[in-house]
């Protein structure tokens, strides 16, 4: 028995699981849906990784434990997931600049090819100075540089929405011109990733409109005029109703990738008019249970699929708990659970984000994950949870 702290400061007894659920990786991708998971980056615990920047300190490249970082991707490929690399889960622009992101994509692509896994890499415009304005030509060239690199290492391209483009574009035509130029040059179909201002206010007015329906029409027009170059789209955060609307306006054959934390079981299962696929950050820490659900769906067992994925919702929502600012520290939970699960040997992070979640929050994550049987070694997980409690003065 272990006593876990509650948000009000009291301690509540909890009896950890003694026998973890059995998960047998199949090393084969899912067949019923395309399922991407992102994956966190493992920091080098012995290095002087910089603390959170205030905006005026010189940038210092992060020190990454590459072996542990790539090993976690191997865990995901073995479960059947494709891996989406160098997005916000990997500290993109929150510790990792383009140079570090490129190295991450290169190493992950090399390992993906070795094990037969699917890999995609995010392209952005983050090599541009964020403190000064840039022309459309500058932004286009930045995108082109990163696309050339990602394609060159054999990864699929995910084109992320650019804050610099949002700042510079004067009309919907400017957005359309940039994206059509990039898509015309792409050698393989890409994923278009549009983040809404609810998550990143810098992207307000993307596609030249602040109205959702008008922006969606402009976005869909770009996809429809380049349908042979678009594998799929991800828009986040969107409601259940808006994701279904997105599915209805996309051309046939273009995947709509879900990444939410509330309705993903139903949206991915779909309805008589179609379904979503997945490009989800939250699948990384939930991988064994999520994989079991998709294996059931592959076999036509929708009842087990629903039960497995719905069982993860309380933990998924807890990992992203908080307002728009604190929600960004979901990576702390991801690293914490990876450490408890034995995927890495320490609980240290780039920018010192291991301290970004409260001890009661981490304790609840432990309890929910243990309840799902996510820990391969329940005794190890309990021991490491006790270390966190002792560090906080809880004995």
Where do the model's predicted regions map?
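Structured C-terminal cap/extension of enzyme domains
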Residues: 266-395
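Charged, low-complexity C-terminal accessory regions
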Residues: 1, 14-17, 28, 131-136, ...
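Alpha-helical scaffold segments in soluble metabolic enzymes
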Residues: 107, 181, 221, 292, ...
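General structural feature for long, well-ordered alpha-helical segments within catalytic domains
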Residues: 65-68, 72, 100, 104, ...
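Short amphipathic alpha-helical segments, especially helix-boundary/capping motifs
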Residues: 37-38, 79-85, 153-157, 218-222, ...
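Active-site beta->alpha loop and helix N-cap motifs at the rims of alpha/beta catalytic domains
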Residues: 3-21, 26-213, 351-357, 372-395
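Catalytic alpha/beta core domains of metabolic enzymes, predominantly
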Residues: 189-327
